[in-house]
């Protein structure tokens, strides 16, 4: 089983004093895939990553990364992983080439690896310039290159595109896709849910120290259902439109006065567009546009974490039938705990 998964944990537990940060975390990440780990602040993501990268010891359970046990073989785990944090790890006073050669020397990698990575990330021409003169996108590419010096089996990637413009963000996304195409496994933590939607083969949602849901992006969206949205003729009609949406969907509507929109998620298959239009008309709401569409991952995240906190039941399984709560790991990231 260990040969199938690049990251495999069972029953991970971690306490910090009275705080139970991780509660029986099970995770199974197949080799050569991207697993997106999402959750509110304080949910357990950071603690989980610190354990998997051998920076923190678990209080219970077990974990293997790149085929090695994090407790018994921490040095072997570190040789098999790369870690790219949210903040730049490179020295701004050194050139790009000097930074990578320094990493190569520290990690006992060939000196030629630095030149190879500069070329791969289109930094060769800037290689003789101090890193502090690089743009945000260039520095993130240099960070990513530094994390790949040892050709890791598993790359831990934290907030890889924070603060980047769309063009630079797309460049990082393309680089991550190339890595998985070559067989590297990526564990991605990000607050940009569009990023997880674009990159992740599977997503684990952690809340309150547990993995509450997991599956592909499409499966998690299917849990939530559809998103009903209307554009009203007059912003003054938004409260009335919200009342209609609340009655039909049972969800708290989201209002945008500037765009004159009201929207809410619904899992009720009887909520159709004709029904929505009729109810709005009966309420005297003038409508410019109305529609039902699949939810975004942001809407899924807000819906599932809000329902959990509000005490409402959330389905245990995505529509495709993959377990999302308790049970043994499958080919999808399984339940996990908090940070």
Identify what each model region corresponds to.
Residues 14, 27, 230-233, 264, ...:
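Preference for bulky hydrophobic residues occupying beta-strand positions
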Residues 82, 108, 143, 149, ...:
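A generic structural signal for secondary-structure junctions
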Residues 173-267:
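ABC transporter nucleotide-binding domain
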Residues 3, 269-339:
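C-terminal coupling/interaction segments
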Residues 4-9, 14-208, 213:
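ABC transporter nucleotide-binding domains
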Residues 10, 231, 256, 291-293:
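Solvent-exposed beta-strand sheet faces enriched in polar/charged residues
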């Amino acid at each position: 089983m260990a040969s199938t998964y690049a990251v495999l944990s069972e029953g991970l537990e971690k306490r910090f004093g009275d705080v139970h940060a991780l509660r029986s975390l099970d995770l199974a990440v197949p080799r050569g895939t991207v697993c997106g780990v999402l959750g509110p602040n304080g949910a357990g993501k950071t603690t989980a990553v610190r354990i998997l990268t051998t920076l923190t010891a678990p209080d219970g359970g077990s974990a293997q990364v790149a085929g090695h046990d994090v407790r018994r073989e921490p040095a072997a785990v570190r040789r098999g992983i790369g870690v790219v944090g949210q903040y730049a790890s490179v020295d701004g006073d050194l050139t790009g080439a000097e930074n990578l050669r320094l990493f190569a020397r520290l990690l006992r990698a060939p000196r030629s690896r630095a030149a190879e990575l500069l070329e791969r990330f289109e930094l060769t021409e800037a290689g003789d310039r101090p890193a502090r003169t690089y743009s945000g996108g260039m520095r993130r590419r240099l960070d990513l290159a530094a994390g790949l010096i040892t050709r890791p089996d598993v790359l831990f990637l934290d907030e890889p595109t924070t603060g980047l413009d769309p063009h630079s963000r797309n460049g990082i996304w393309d680089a991550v896709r190339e890595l998985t195409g070559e067989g590297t496994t990526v564990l991605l933590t990000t607050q940009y849910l569009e990023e997880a939607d674009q990159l992740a083969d599977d997503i684990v949602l952690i809340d309150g120290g547990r993995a509450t849901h997991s599956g592909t992006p499409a499966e998690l969206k299917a849990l939530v259902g559809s998103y009903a949205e209307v554009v009203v003729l007059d912003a003054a009609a938004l409260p009335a439109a919200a009342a209609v949406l609340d009655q039909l969907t049972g969800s708290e509507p989201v209002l945008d006065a500037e765009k004159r929109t009201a929207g809410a998620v619904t899992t009720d298959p009887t909520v159709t567009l004709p029904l929505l239009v009729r109810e709005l008309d009966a309420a005297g709401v003038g409508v410019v546009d109305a529609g039902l569409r699949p939810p975004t991952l942001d809407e899924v995240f807000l819906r599932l974490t809000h329902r959990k906190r509000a005490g409402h039941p959330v389905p245990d399984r995505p529509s495709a039938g993959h377990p999302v709560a308790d049970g043994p790991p499958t080919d999808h990231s399984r339940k996990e705990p908090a940070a």
